Swiss-Prot record:
It is found in: Cytoplasm. One of its GO terms (cellular component) is cytosol. PANTHER family: TRNA SULFURTRANSFERASE. This is Probable tRNA sulfurtransferase. It catalyses: [ThiI sulfur-carrier protein]-S-sulfanyl-L-cysteine + a uridine in tRNA + 2 reduced [2Fe-2S]-[ferredoxin] + ATP + H(+) = [ThiI sulfur-carrier protein]-L-cysteine + a 4-thiouridine in tRNA + 2 oxidized [2Fe-2S]-[ferredoxin] + AMP + diphosphate; [ThiS sulfur-carrier protein]-C-terminal Gly-Gly-AMP + S-sulfanyl-L-cysteinyl-[cysteine desulfurase] + AH2 = [ThiS sulfur-carrier protein]-C-terminal-Gly-aminoethanethioate + L-cysteinyl-[cysteine desulfurase] + A + AMP + 2 H(+). SUPFAM superfamilies: Adenine nucleotide alpha hydrolases-like, THUMP domain-like. Its EC number is 2.8.1.4. Keywords: ATP-binding, Cytoplasm, Nucleotide-binding, RNA-binding, Thiamine biosynthesis, Transferase, tRNA-binding. InterPro entries: Rossmann-like_a/b/a_fold, ThiI_AANH, ThiI_fer, ThiI_N, THUMP_dom, THUMP_ThiI, tRNA_STrfase, tRNA_sulfurtransferase_ThiI. ATP binds at M183, L184, H208, F209, R265, G287, Q296.
Length: 404
């Protein structure tokens, strides 16, 4: 027998009252986006559950993709069969012969949405249980926590059988908590921060600062590949490339070395906030982890934050590096993050960055520059690319493959 569909049960959105259908519709769209790489699969959703109709697609691959989608509590692969007692009996026997191992217990759990079916739920449990005994005479029934719970659902159009329940990612459907701008470098921390924001329903757009010729096409492709890894949790992501060369050269020419990182981060924050405003975002998200580097002390965070009143979410701020690496490996971003391409935060990094920068000093050094003009030109020069779960291999991929 071949699975015909996957029955999907919702997570936390079940508590959302009047907004329930908005959450469900968003989850349906997210599932459709993530499963778009399987052209045969069709997704529907109603108030109680969603369904992914396989239409011949490989169940194992689709299930692996579904495990990543936030807002799903669990799901079950389902067999669709003819709605007749004899077909149900033979189907139940076939399934049990395939999955039963010596000593296992079972029960039948039936429900009907088609109340015109010839047997009610209790009668169906008894009839199908009897069919199992015919196929496996020594099998034991156990009503509480059996090894196999064979679920039977009689609907208007057909009957559906399932026995396996697979845990989903939980969380909230991406996009139900508003939009945030993720400051995405090529490092380990910021993709993890993006993942954790996605889990709480934030629709992220990735803002990446590029400083050619100091940063290479490989560094840009690396950031896009990290973004692509995040699409499997909620669908397509807008990747915003910011030209940052002029600003970094200006900072290096007009500010003391100890303040290079502080001023760089202040400009990044200003630009990200300006993009957020234009694109209707609510928050800025970054991968800062307290004390991990010089720009991530509390004093540095205060000096950098001073350029905006927008809330800054730091999902990994209290984690140590090993905790962050564990998550990066789990979400499959770690190997990309450690590729040897420098980002714009490292190319002009001073030997002795200031760990307790003063806001008044930062403002004094910025007074030597045309801050507003620099920000405006950077924002005017952004390039936006929609990153999808699947992308064709290009020349930069080939170059990277040759280098690694």
């Amino acid at each position: 027998m071949q699975y015909s569909e996957i029955m999907i049960r919702y997570g936390e959105l079940s508590t959302k009252g009047k907004n329930r259908m908005r959450f469900i519709n968003k989850l349906r769209n997210n599932i459709s986006d993530v499963l778009s790489i399987y052209s045969q699969v069709k997704v529907t959703a109603d108030r109680d559950r969603a369904h992914a109709y396989l239409n011949g697609a490989d169940y194992t691959a689709v299930a692996e993709s579904l495990k990543q989608v936030f807002g799903i509590q669990n799901f079950s692969p389902v067999y669709k069969v003819e709605k007749s007692v004899e077909v149900l009996k033979s189907s139940v026997q076939e399934i049990m012969r395939d999955i039963y191992k010596e000593g296992m217990t079972f029960k039948i759990s039936s429900k009907r949405s088609d109340h015109n079916f010839e047997l009610d739920s209790r009668e169906l449990n008894q009839t199908l249980g009897g069919a199992v005994f015919e196929a496996i005479p020594n099998v034991q029934v156990q009503m509480k926590s059996p090894d196999i719970n064979l679920q039977v659902e009689i609907r208007e159009e057909a009957a559906y059988l399932s026995y396996e329940t697979i845990r989903g990612a939980g969380g909230l459907p991406v996009g139900t908590s508003g939009k945030g701008m993720l400051m995405l470098s090529g490092g380990i921390d910021s993709p993890v921060a993006g993942y954790l924001a996605l889990k709480r329903g934030v629709d992220i757009e990735a803002v990446h600062f590029a400083s050619p010729p100091y940063t290479s096409p490989g560094a840009l492709k690396k950031a896009q590949d990290l973004t692509r890894k995040l699409t499997k949790f909620g669908g397509n992501i807008q990747f915003i490339e910011v030209p940052f060369t002029e600003i970094q050269e200006e900072i290096k020419a007009k500010a003391p070395e100890a303040y290079l990182m502080t001023l760089t981060r202040r400009f990044m924050m200003r630009i990200t906030d300006r993009i957020r405003e234009v694109r209707n975002g609510l928050v800025i998200i970054n991968g800062e982890s307290l004390g991990q580097v010089a720009s991530q002390t509390l004093e540095s965070m205060k000096a950098i934050n001073a350029v905006t009143n927008t809330p800054i979410i730091r999902p990994v701020v209290t984690m140590d590096k090993l905790e962050i690496i564990d998550i990066a490996q789990e979400i499959d971003t770690f190997d990309i993050s450690i590729q040897p391409f420098e980002d714009c935060c490292t190319i002009f990094a001073p030997d002795r960055p200031k760990t307790n920068p003063k806001i008044k000093n930062a403002e004094q050094y910025e007074a030597r520059m045309d801050v507003e003009g620099l920000v405006e030109r950077a924002v005017a020069g952004i390039m936006i690319t929609e990153i999808t779960p699947q992308a064709e291999k290009d020349e930069v991929d080939d170059l990277i493959d040759n280098l690694l």
